[in-house]
UniProtKB/Swiss-Prot annotation:
It comes from Gallus gallus. Residues 10-51 form the JmjN domain. Residues 180-229, 1353-1373, 1400-1460 are annotated as: Disordered. Residues 180-192, 1426-1442 have a biased composition (Basic and acidic residues). Both the JmjC domain and the JmjN domain are required for enzymatic activity. However ARID and PHD-type 1 domain are not required for activity per se but contributed to recognition of the H3(1-21)K4me2 substrate peptide. The 2 first PHD-type zinc finger domains are required for transcription repression activity. Its cofactor is Fe(2+). It catalyses: N(6),N(6),N(6)-trimethyl-L-lysyl(4)-[histone H3] + 3 2-oxoglutarate + 3 O2 = L-lysyl(4)-[histone H3] + 3 formaldehyde + 3 succinate + 3 CO2. Keywords: Biological rhythms, Chromatin regulator, Dioxygenase, Iron, Metal-binding, Nucleus, Oxidoreductase, Repeat, Repressor, Transcription, Transcription regulation, Zinc, Zinc-finger. CDD domains: ARID_KDM5B, PHD1_KDM5B, PHD2_KDM5B, PHD3_KDM5B. It comes from the Eukaryota. Its EC number is 1.14.11.67. Residues 428-594 form the JmjC domain. The gene is KDM5B. SUPFAM superfamilies: ARID-like, Clavaminate synthase-like, FYVE/PHD zinc finger. This is Lysine-specific demethylase 5B.
Length: 1522
């Protein structure tokens, strides 16, 4: 089967609220469009949502059962045919099984039709057309299908066709219909047996099993009662087992057979029982063909009539006794020739409520499509529906709750006095015309004149649908309109054909399914047959479709066939209505019903007469239409009564037919409801006929008939005349209208009287004819004239000057005003505004005369023009002079604007010129305006040229020189206008000149420029769009400074350091805080008076500001020196406070230590600088295997502390740059501070106090307060904090110091309490830790102070200072060979030329002065080469010290040149040798000091061959470098 193609959509209307207010007016409006499609859909306004008024719990109904494939006309014909074939073979004891051909069920109906079309079985066989028939049936050619089809036809269909043709079947051998095991058993539908009268026990709407079965089953169909059940109605599908003789005899004795009487004289539909056979045993066993009773075992007994036949007497003879029921040839013909009964729906056995039906419907749909009901597409349901109705292989049964009376269960719309209580906001739906309870009885509906409550027509019917439940092709009763509203639920799919195609649709269905119409001529009126819209469209029938959703109306028009089905569970309500235009169609429908013998729902003539009896209140149009229809009715009635009278019916009487029930006054022949007249005979009381069928009443003579009439003809004419009078009642009104329209000036009526005539027409509902339309038009014109006149009298001009000077669309010209006044006088009615407008016209004409006089002058003044314009404001009339007056006024004002704009020098901008030119262009030509325009245009051209040129000069790349820009500025200054780009260019030139002056002033001063000044100049110079010669040099200088700062930061700053370079180089300003974001609590010990903790940001910013503001280096050094003093003082106070925490009692709850600011808890570690205590779990501590080291806390560890040789190149490069910056001053001060410290440290080393201090340390005097030994420091997973030069390796006995065990300040490592030994040494070591430079003197001091071993042991322990030696080795850098050799030769020469006197020898030794690590470096020697030589000497000193076992506890630092005459050996353990021959050796490291050879253990040979590096220079590397 081809896929279903949806027909085109019908029109969909969406009325506005105004259109929706009157349903009949709206339907009348859309009728020309919707009639062309038969159906249409109406979507109410969105806010129109009536409440659902049905009682869901109380509404119950019994639905109809619908088997889908029995609804379609062509499918039902096939099923009826197959049922006849099955019945034919069943009566002969065989079961029909439909064969398969090419794995497809053979369509027996199509095969039978095609063979008949080709001429019958004999012709097809003779002409060999079986292959052609197979091809027409869709089988592929060339597979010998034709022979198979012939065999099946000959076996199954040929005997049936012979029987239908009347041939005797006695000679036919019964074929073996059950031999083919592949055939499918056919299950008859028993369609005629399923009537709506007797509902079955249970028939749920579920998908049934396929009709075609592989195995035979015994299926029985129960008849009405067991007493009248017969074998021929049982239609058993399988062969029953043979019955025993006793059972057959008993059954045959009581069996009855139905026999239909065909004689014309007997009454219809009266069945008679077949007369019973004699019960003689001889008669029961006698063959009717041979008359013999012999061979009883071969004697067949008919299951229908109990006649007996020998098997061998039948032609051809039967070899065996049939196993199933067997009918003789007479019974077979009797059963098969019974007329087919009409098809109808049967009622379901179950009663449903809305809830139970909905549950069943949703379950069916979801199970069928295997998805939720709301997810099934409507297109899928539509295609599946038309597939199911067209197949005979699948039975799908559904139920439909149709035609449920709303009178019994209540309408879905709210009604007055109903059980449903509406809310106040819902009361509008009670009286709405779209409420289906109101529409049929509205005044515009002719059904309102029918008093009876006709269900479905005047009273709505309710419809509860489920998926696939359908309504078949039909037209409404009496060809009326219908309207259907879907209250809720899933959509309803509609199909409709227009009314003009109704007969065409009927002809197509009769053509395609003639068998159905033979038994039911009015089949399409039974609502039991559908046909695929595609089939109808293929035969030329126009069909349209739509999906009606919840809240939408569907309207069908007169005689428009429509059908459809439901997409799922829903609830709809429908009713009929008839408009005036339906009346002619209604009479035509009655004639059509008479031909079909169809019952009428109401009497059309009765309705016409009732309307005629109310002629005085009928609408004029309705009265006119009813009068025309009544005229036809009277003519027909007059003709029919004359005909009856000619037939001999003379007796008559008046009968009130409207008092009889409709079924008691129906014509016996055509079923028409009689009202005007009827004929009846005394022989058949209660039986009557209409005047069309008098001859069909009975066989009595016609003079015995009696004519019953409702009205005499004399009574009918006055009724018609009343309608006519009603239709003509507005003649008087029309006369009044004509008189008013044609009245003279003196007799004219007022506008109010005209409106009264219109109101009268509306009140009496006069037809909308030309006269009424003309009256409305005249009245509307007069009303408009009155409104305009009042506006002209009351209104003034809305604006003083209208743009463009054009006419306002609503304004009248003077001529129009003059014509309008004339029109007012010409109106059929009188207006009160007419004389007032005449006065207005006079004043306007006076204004025109004055304007013309003023405009004729050569140059009117602006004041006069304005005064005249002010007068015109009182006239709401378009005056032609106003435009010219405004033009003159605009010209005068424009010239004034030009003069004001040019009054001041350089006040005229480009925008002003453009604005004036733009406004002047719109002015009318005038000499003064044109001259001013020319000047402005010339000035604008020049100004734009120079403005663009100035803009280009500013944006030029590369930038223009200052001299060229100065020339351009001079040119621009000569233009009498303000140029934005010119002003910008002038400003740029001025800025460039100022900038150059500042740069030149900076050069002239001779001072070293400050970095901030340079950065500010560079920033300003980049923003000036002028080529500046000095700018690249300044940018290069700033870039060098930035590069220097980055190099310095890489040298000093630790990785991810929180400190800036300036913070590291300057003296500390944050001493006393832990650098935390939150403010810490003060310790109990008071700070020194006048000292206050300050935040790092404030102090650093103050110091940086002071450095930036300093005029020269000297003032900067002074500032930094002051900061150093504050640093030292603050650190001393902090150390004292931290040391004092040890003496605090354990009960002191406010005592907080460490970065976590919590109470002390062992183990702890103490910072060497600030003497603060820290939990070993809060900070990174050295690993136990690394030995004791000097440890600094995170606050005191600020930089990498590079060695001095790394810092000196930075200072040298800074001097080359010659730019002052705070970081440079800080670096100079740090180096100067370092050198000063070195000098103090050397003095301490050279003095004899160190020996005494070393003895004190060795005797343990410093640790007499420690009482016990602490365990080793617990290991931690944190990385050991080796803080540059601060992580010194301590002697091996450092861990053997005693510490206070029971104190919470028990530490793994504590600081050296030097303040107990020497305040000077404590100050020196404290400042050593503050220095951000690695110095060998620091390590030397620690080694001297804390080494207790003898010199021999010290020499043995020298390798323990491996890191220092290794670092010293690494400190050897590149070395200038020539300078090194020159120094060696010079030293040898000096040693040979020593004089005997020590002083002279020492002076000669010091004559070649060595380089000093001071700020006053000589310029002839570069710092970089000096550092390379010092690095090489360090390496040589290291090798020398390793070979000679130089003691590691001795360290020397470089000393400044002294003018002292006495030479001093810097060795700490100087032996002070006496004599003239004392040998000296000079250190080849960085210090260049002279030592006694005997004091340092060097022989003369070694001094000649090897380089000597003192212990101080050899120790600069490892401990101090990271």
């Amino acid at each position: 089967m081809a896929e279903f193609l949806p027909p085109p959509e019908c029109p969909v209307f969406e009325p506005s609220w105004e259109e929706f207010a009157d349903p009949f007016a709206f339907i009348h409006k859309i009728r020309p469009i919707a009639e062309q499609t038969g159906i249409c859909k109406v979507r109410p306004p969105p806010d129109w949502q009536p409440p659902f008024a049905c009682d869901v719990d109380k509404l119950h109904f019994t639905p109809r059962i619908q088997r889908l494939n029995e609804l379609e006309a062509q499918t039902r014909v096939k099923l009826n045919f197959l049922d006849q074939i099955a019945k034919f073979w069943e009566l002969q004891g065989c079961t029909l099984k439909i064969p398969h051909v090419e794995r497809k069920i053979l369509d027996l109906f199509q095969l039978n039709r095609l063979v008949a079309e080709e001429g019958g079985f004999d012709v097809v066989c003779k002409e060999r057309k079986w292959t052609k028939i197979a091809t027409r049936m869709g089988f592929a050619p060339g597979k010998a299908v034709g022979s198979h089809i012939r065999a099946h036809y000959e076996r199954i269909l040929y005997p049936y066709n012979l029987f239908q043709s009347g041939a005797s079947l006695l000679c036919l051998q019964k074929p073996d219909l059950t031999s083919d095991t592949k055939d499918k058993e056919y299950k008859p539908h028993d369609i005629p047996q399923r009537q709506s009268v007797q509902p079955s026990e249970s028939c749920p709407p579920a998908r049934r099993a396929k009709r075609l079965r592989a195995e035979a089953t015994n299926i029985k169909t129960e008849s009405d009662s067991p007493e009248v059940r017969t074998h021929n109605l049982r239609r058993r599908m399988g062969c029953a087992p043979p019955k025993c003789e006793n059972e057959k005899e008993t059954y045959s004795a009581v069996k009855l057979a139905e026999k239909r009487e065909h004689a014309g004289e007997q009454e219809r539909d009266k069945a008679k029982a077949r007369s019973k056979k004699p019960t003689s045993a001889v008669d029961l066993y006698v063959c009717l063909l041979c008359g013999s009773g012999n061979d009883e075992d071969r004697l067949l007994l008919c299951d229908g009539c109990d006649d007996s036949y020998h098997t061998f007497c039948l032609i051809p003879p039967l070899h065996d006794v049939p196993k199933g029921d067997w009918r003789c040839p007479q019974c077979l013909a009797q059963e098969c020739n019974k007329p087919q009964e009409a098809f109808g729906f049967e009622q379901a056995a179950r009663d449903y409520t809305l809830r139970t039906f909905g549950e069943m419907a949703d379950a069916f749909k979801s199970d069928y499509f295997n998805m939720p009901v709301h997810m099934v597409p409507t297109e899928l349901v539509e295609k599946e529906f038309w597939r199911l109705v067209s197949t005979i292989e699948e039975d799908v049964t559904v139920e439909y709750g149709a035609d449920i009376a709303s009178k019994e269960f209540g309408s879905g719309f709210p009604v007055r006095d109903g059980k449903f209580k509406v809310r106040p906001e819902e009361e509008e739906y009670l009286d709405s015309g779209w409420n289906l309870n109101n529409m049929p009885v509205m005044e515009q509906s002719v059904l309102a004149h029918i008093t009876a409550d006709i269900c479905g027509m005047k009273l709505p019917w309710l419809y509860v649908g489920m998926c696939f439940s359908s309504f078949c092709w039909h037209i409404e009763d009496h060809w009326s309109y219908s309207i259907n509203y879907l209250h809720w639920g899933e959509p309803k799919t509609w199909y409709g054909a227009p009314g003009y195609a109704a007969e065409q649709l009927e002809d197509v269905m009769k053509k395609l399914a003639p068998e159905l119409f033979e038994s039911q001529p009015d089949l399409l009126h039974q609502l039991v047959t559908i046909m695929n819209p595609n089939t109808l469209m293929a035969h030329g029938v126009p069909v349209y479709r739509t999906n009606q959703c919840a809240g939408e109306f569907v309207i069908t028009f007169p005689r428009a066939y429509h059908s459809g089905f439901n997409q799922g569970f829903n609830f709809a309500e429908a009713v009929n209505f008839c408009t005036v235009d339906w009346l002619p169609l209604g009479r035509q429908c009655i004639e059509h019903y008479r031909l079909l013998s169809r019952y009428c729902v109401f009497s059309h003539d009765e309705m016409i007469c009732k309307m005629a009896s109310k002629a005085d209140i009928l609408d004029v149009v309705v009265a006119s239409t009813v009068q025309k229809d009544m005229a036809i009715m009277i003519d027909d009635e007059k003709m029919l009564r004359e005909k009856v009278q000619k037939l001999g019916v003379t007796d008559s009487e008046r009968v009130a037919f409207e008092l009889f029930p409709d079924d008691e006054r129906q014509c016996y022949k055509c079923k028409t409801t009689c009202f005007m007249s009827a004929v009846y005979c005394p022989c058949k009381p209660g039986l009557l006929v209409c005047l069309y069928h008098v001859e069909d009443l009975c066989s009595c003579p016609t003079y015995q008939y009696k004519l019953g009439y409702r009205y005499t003809l004399e009574e009918l004419y006055p009724m018609m005349n009343a309608l006519k009078m009603r239709a003509e009642s507005y003649n008087e009104w029309a006369s009044n209208v004509n008189e008013a329209l044609e009245a003279k000036i003196s007799n004219k009526r007022s506008l109010i009287s005209f409106k009264a005539l219109i109101e009268e027409s509306e009140l009496k509902k006069f037809p909308d004819n030309d006269l009424l339309r003309h009256l409305r038009l005249v009245t509307q014109d007069a009303d408009k004239c009155a409104s305009v006149a009042q506006q002209l009298l009351n209104g003034k001009r809305q604006t003083r000057y209208r743009s463009g000077g054009g006419k306002c669309p609503n304004q009248l010209t003077v001529n129009e005003l003059r014509l309008f006044v004339r029109q007012l006088y010409a109106l059929p009615c009188v207006l009160s505004q007419t004389p007032l407008l005449k006065d207005l016209l006079d004043r306007v004409e006076a204004f025109q005369q004055q304007s013309q006089k003023l405009l004729s002058e050569e140059m009117p003044s602006a004041a006069e023009l304005q005064e005249l314009l002010d007068v015109s404001f009182d006239f709401d009339v378009d005056l032609p002079q106003l435009a010219e007056l405004r033009v003159r006024l605009e010209q005068a004002r424009w010239l004034e604007d030009v003069q004001m704009a040019s009054a001041e020098q350089n006040s005229l901008t480009l925008d002003d010129m453009r604005r004036l030119i733009d406004s002047g262009v719109g002015l009318a030509p005038y000499p003064a305006v044109e001259k001013a325009m020319a000047k402005l245009q010339e000035l604008l051209t020049v100004s734009e040229h120079w403005d663009d040129k100035a803009r280009n000069l500013i944006k030029a790349r590369p930038r223009q020189s200052l001299s060229s820009l100065v020339v351009a500025v001079k040119e621009i200054e000569e233009i009498p206008a303000y140029l934005p780009s010119g002003a910008a260019l002038k400003d740029a030139v001025q800025k460039a000149q100022d900038w150059l002056q500042e740069v030149e002033a900076l050069q002239v001063g001779g001072r070293v420029p400050v970095l901030d000044t340079l950065v500010e100049l560079v920033t300003r110079g980049r923003s000036i769009p002028v080529h500046l010669d000095y700018l690249p040099r300044l940018e290069s200088l700033v870039a060098e400074v930035q590069a220097w700062k980055e190099c310095a930061a890489n040298t000093f700053l630790c990785e991810n350091s929180p400190y800036s370079l300036l913070e590291v180089l300057c003296p500390r300003c944050d001493i006393g805080t832990l650098g935390l974001k939150r403010k810490q609590k003060k310790l109990k010990e008071p700070m020194p008076s006048g000292k206050k903790r300050s935040t790092k940001l404030e102090s650093l910013s103050d110091l940086e500001r002071a450095l930036s503001e300093s005029k020269d280096t000297a003032s900067a050094m002074a500032t930094l020196g002051e900061a150093r003093l504050k640093e030292m003082e603050a650190l001393r106070s902090l150390r004292a406070a931290n040391e004092g925490k040890v003496l605090c009692s354990e009960e002191d709850a406010e005592l907080k230590v460490c970065v976590c600011q919590k109470e002390p808890a062992a183990p702890m570690i103490q910072c060497e600088l600030c003497r603060g205590f820290f939990h070993t779990g809060c900070v990174s501590v050295p690993h136990a295997l690394q030995g004791p080291r000097v440890w600094l806390c995170p606050q005191c560890r600020r930089s990498e502390k590079p060695p001095l040789e790394k810092i000196l190149p930075l200072l040298a490069s800074l001097q080359r740059i010659r730019v002052r910056l705070p970081e440079g001053d800080a670096l100079r001060y740090m180096i100067e501070r370092t050198v000063n410290w070195q000098h103090r440290a050397q003095q301490m080393l050279y003095s004899g106090n160190l020996k005494l201090l070393q003895d004190k340390v060795g005797s343990g005097l410093l640790y007499n307060r420690w009482q016990s030994t602490a365990g080793p420091l617990p290991e931690t997973n944190k990385v050991s904090q080796t803080i540059g030069a601060m992580s010194f390796s301590m002697p091996h006995d450092w861990d053997n110091r005693t510490i206070y065990l029971h104190s919470p300040f028990s530490t793994g490592q504590q600081c050296i309490p030097l303040h107990v030994v020497s305040t000077e040494l404590d100050e020196l070591m404290m400042e050593a830790q503050l220095l951000q430079v690695s110095l060998p003197e620091i390590q030397e001091l620690y080694q001297i102070l804390f080494t207790k071993q003898s010199p021999s042991l010290q020499a043995e322990q020298k390798p323990s200072v491996g890191p220092s030696n290794e670092k010293s080795e690494c400190c050897r850098g590149k070395k200038d060979g020539m300078s090194y050799m020159e120094r060696k030769l010079k030293r040898r020469f000096e040693r040979e030329s020593f004089c005997d006197e020590k002083r002279a020898r020492v002076r000669k030794m010091r004559t070649p002065k060595k380089k000093k690590l001071k700020l006053s470096h000589t310029k002839d020697v570069s710092s970089s080469s000096r550092m390379e030589r010092e690095r090489e000497r360090l390496l040589e000193a290291q090798r020398s010290s390793e070979s000679h076992l130089v003691p590691s506890d001795t360290s020397f630092s470089e000393q400044e040149d002294s003018e002292d005459e006495d030479a001093i050996c810097p060795a700490v353990t100087c032996l002070q040798p006496e004599g003239e021959e004392v040998d000296w050796v000079q250190c080849d490291g960085s210090c260049n000091q002279w030592f006694h050879q005997v004091c340092v253990g060097i022989s003369p040979e070694m001094a000649e061959k090897e380089d000597y590096i003192c212990a101080s220079c050899a120790g600069k590397g490892s401990p101090y470098r990271k």
